[in-house]
Amino acid sequence: GLKFRIPSFGGEVMSRLGVAVATIPVGELYMALEMGTIDAVEWASPSFDIPLGFHKVANYYYTGWQEPASEQQIVINLQTWQKLPKDLQNILEASIAKAREYAENETFYKNVIIWDEIKKKYPNVQIRSFSPEIMRALRKATDEILAEESEKNPDFKEIWESQKAFLAKARTWTKMGDFTYIEKTGDVEAEQNFTASGKK
C-alpha cells in the first residue's frame, strides 16, 4: 500500500484506510522521498514545504484535510508563573499573544506568495485534491476514531463535544463571511475581466 509519513491522529485515520503509516524526522524526509522509502509526506504548508525541497522529489501536491488549523502552545510551570510579579505576567502574556499573531500573519503572507510561485516556477508540480469518495472514507474513519476515543476517555469526550458545538456555529459564520466574500468578489472580478476583453 501507500507509504505515507503522517503522524498522530491523521496517521491513525490513514492507517484505517490501508495506508502504511511512517513517522520520520524532518531532517530525513527529503531523502526518504527521493529514495522511495516513503511515497508521500504530510508536513505543513507551502511556506514550510517548498524550502525543504519536497517539490524536487514529488510531483503531486495535495491540499490537506487533516489539519484545518494549527495550535501554538507555550507551557509554563505553574509554581514558577505564580512567583512572577503581576507586571511581568502581563508583559509575558502580551508578548506571547503578539508572537502568535506575528507568526500567523507571517505564515499566511508567505503561503500566499509561495503558492503563487509554485504554479509559475515549478510546472512539474501538479496540484490535486482528494476525490469525494476518498474524503467520505476519511470522514467515516475520523468519526469512528473520535467515537472510540470519546468512549474510553471522558476528558476527550468533553473536549470533543465542546469543539463540535462551536464548529457548528463557526461553519455558519465562515460560510456567510469568508466563503460569501470569496464567491461574490470572484464573480465580480470575472465579470470585469470578461467586459474588459470586449465580450458581452
Question: For the regions a protein language model found, what residue spans apply to each?
Answer:
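N-terminal secretory/targeting leader peptides
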Residues: G1-K200
